[in-house]
Amino acid sequence: MTTSKSPINVAIWAYAIAKKSLPAYSHEKSPHKYTQHQLFALLILKQFFQEDYRGLVGIIADFSDIRKVLELEIVPHYTTLQKASKRLLSSKKIQKLLQTTIKAAQHIELLKEQSSLSALDSTGMEAGHTSRYFVKRRQRGEENMYQTTTYRRFPKLALNCDCRTHIITGLLVGKGPSPDVVHFKKLLRQAHNNLPIQTITADAGYDSESNHIFARDALKIHSIINPKTGCPTKKLPSGKYRREMVEHFDKDKYGQRWQSETVMSMLKRNLSESIFSKNYWSQRREMALKVLSHNIMIV
């Protein structure tokens, strides 16, 4: 699926989606200088242009057509946008905005009422400021010996996408390294609530009998997860659904799982793989904003 390269088109859609998702002002007594709709659209454009707050303000000051589209009489100070990011990108508001992008895709008949095939995946993002932590692992057979292993913390994004349209229907943001398998249920439930799913595919990182049971029995979603996790063995898995994956693995449908990798590539290519925010919560907001920007650029 192609993405828009027009900042005017992106601004129009971002502005419209914000109007459907958010009240004009956060509080009746708040300063009525800029609407939340205008500020959200500007945050999307920040991602589109891959600029910092100061850089975006400079672009908007020179771009009268964008100001006209957003009904913006005065260009906000960059600190106004920084504060707006904290206020507009709370978890609840992100979900509301994500749901509105999905409805927008349905409105233009890009997305159907349900996803016949979806895929889960995760990726690490580049951060300019990364911290290290140390893990001490007791060496096997040595009672008081420890092995020190160094890891690099990085912003991590997990998502679910519709394989046909590349629209993202669910997201989780956090820190890596972390196992994918523990996020499967939360991410799948969120995505299924946003857009009903018929079949879900996922790589071996999400493989567990518990995840199959949750998808198939709790949500009534057909799950196809690569069963080749853990040490290689000739023994069949003991679980019903993991055994089915070994004996009757649907290679054709699972082959479409690469569409999620395409979405990750689109995100990093169009909106940068770098996360410029320095602290954890700002990084979470920036990753969520990339997802919203991706969907808006598609519609």
PLM region spans:
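Polybasic low-complexity intrinsically disordered regions
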Residues: 31, 37, 48, 90-217
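Mobile genetic element proteins and their domesticated derivatives, centered on retroelements
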Residues: 42, 56, 77, 81, ...
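Helix-centered, glycine/charged polyanion-binding patches within enzymatic domains
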Residues: 204-271
